[in-house]
Amino acid sequence: MAPETRRNLLADPAEPTLLPADPEPEPGDPAEAVAAARRHPASRIAWAVLAEQSLTDATDTSDIRAYAFARTGYHRSLDALRRNGWRGSGPIPWEHEPNRGFLRALWALSVAAQR
């Protein structure tokens, strides 16, 4: 039996979505991350950093906190993606630094949801 070639269902011919710069620089410590999220609640990177920091504590309470922070970052990111032309599919490249807040929040959400 000859091998079949199947179409890649994940392949998307859409152009990659490139988010604009985040309103906050990446916070370096928990206090900076809290201050950044308070100043700019739409900051993708602030929520991602808060989630990542909470994941490192590895307690039940910090896991719930991480999930909430990651979920907030994820939804703030979806809002930004849609404002920039994303329609629910298509590449969001890691190489474009402003996309990293979304991708990091998505990663943190997946980790927190499994704890």
Indicate residue ranges for each PLM-predicted region.
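N-terminal alpha-helical interaction modules that lie
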Residues: 1-91, 97, 106, 111-115
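Short, solvent-exposed interaction modules
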Residues: 102
